[in-house]
């Protein structure tokens, strides 16, 4: 079995919103515009979230992923090859992050998102305090637990979801801010 590819050097920060740090069932919309002067032959995005994420680039769904490992204090990192989703000029990465502090207290991780995009060894973007974030009020809480050992029931209000927030044409309003809780990445597993 081969070791998965990691970035040459890990940059960026874990980002989140202070008002949701102690909220055990929360959603955060995150986005970052960036410019690609030339789309390289291979552009990679590494991403991790506690607890889960859905990833979009230029309005297209790229993937979803990990739940931070609960027992050993580490976080999983997903690798997405994203060249296909990029365009020359302005691009946007958008991530919906869900955090759930398990009822039994197993999830000791702080909520957050970390990501880093690079091409040909050059960093294109990473998660930091320049991103735009908005509480996911369209995912209504509090929600009922399905059962003692299962997750929460779903309750989504599409009227409160910002239209086209995953696309470059979207213009954030005053409900968007910068993440006010950032933590250095350091070594994965030290969260």
Where in the sequence are the language-model features?
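Small beta-barrel nucleic-acid-binding modules, principally OB-folds
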Residues: 2-3, 31-39, 43
């Amino acid at each position: 079995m081969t070791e998965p590819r990691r970035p040459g050097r890990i940059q960026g920060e874990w980002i989140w919103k202070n008002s949701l740090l102690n909220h055990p069932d929360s959603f955060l919309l995150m986005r970052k515009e960036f410019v690609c002067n030339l789309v390289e032959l291979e552009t990679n995005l590494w991403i991790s979230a506690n607890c889960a994420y859905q990833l979009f680039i230029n309005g297209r769904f790229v993937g979803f992923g990990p739940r931070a490992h609960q027992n050993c204090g580490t976080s999983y990192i997903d690798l997405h090859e994203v060249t296909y989703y990029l365009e020359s000029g302005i691009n946007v990465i958008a991530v919906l992050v869900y955090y759930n502090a398990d009822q039994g207290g197993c999830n000791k991780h702080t909520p957050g998102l970390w990501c880093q995009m690079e091409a040909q060894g050059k960093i294109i973007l990473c998660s930091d305090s320049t991103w735009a974030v908005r509480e996911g009020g369209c995912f209504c809480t509090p929600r009922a637990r399905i059962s003692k050992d299962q997750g929460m029931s779903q309750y989504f209000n599409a009227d409160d979801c910002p239209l086209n927030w995953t696309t470059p044409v979207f213009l954030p309003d005053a409900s968007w801010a910068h993440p006010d809780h950032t933590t250095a990445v350091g070594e994965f597993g030290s969260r």
